């Protein structure tokens, strides 16, 4: 039944997938020589709108990917096991506010840098996730394509946020130094159950953080329009 539901969902999403890809506005800021020279020509307002749209799409696709993975590879007892085992997200140690009151109190500068930290923290883990999903028997192309798409769009989002920091805060371009995790450098192959639970945790945590990126960026947009009405 789970497999049938997953297939139904995959067919439905496949029909919408081309529209999802074409609906997003381009955000690629990097020229072929590696310089971030495209986005600086876009107005600050339009760039923020594009960054928000990218964050919205990334969250939506991450939500679909997590649900598809869950339906195909994670029976309900294992879903409960993950919740009870207390798996932690890789970004838990980052100094990023999580409560509504904390988020409302932070500055625009910290909002942007919080988004950038989240984005950069997930670039390398998503590359790992692409590689490990390729080893799954029966992993649908839809899931593989979604993971690859999110990974590529996350890099575009990073570029957009970096330029946005330059425009809004008049700061130099932030360096993109990734905090490598030993979790993704272990050459030993975990057993299938361990691999499934680890990948499920990654997808679930990324979905949560992608939503947080979207919320922070939309709060920033609200502040640009009317700082007193942003809840």
UniProtKB/Swiss-Prot annotation:
The keyword Secreted applies. SUPFAM superfamilies: 4-helical cytokines. Keywords: Disulfide bond, Glycoprotein, Hormone, Secreted, Signal. GO terms for biological process: animal organ development; growth hormone receptor signaling pathway; positive regulation of growth; positive regulation of receptor signaling pathway via JAK-STAT; response to nutrient levels. It holds the Pfam family Hormone_1. Disulfide bonds join 29-39, 89-205, 222-230. One of its GO terms (cellular component) is extracellular space. The keyword Methyltransferase does not apply. Residues 1-24 form the signal peptide. It comes from the Eukaryota. InterPro entries: 4_helix_cytokine-like_core, Somatotropin/Prolactin, Somatotropin_CS. Glycans are attached at residues 35, 145. GO terms for molecular function: growth hormone activity; growth hormone receptor binding. It is found in: Secreted. Pituitary gland. PANTHER family: SOMATOLACTIN ALPHA ISOFORM X1-RELATED, SOMATOTROPIN,PROLACTIN. Belongs to the somatotropin/prolactin family. This is Somatolactin. It comes from Siganus guttatus (Orange-spotted spinefoot).
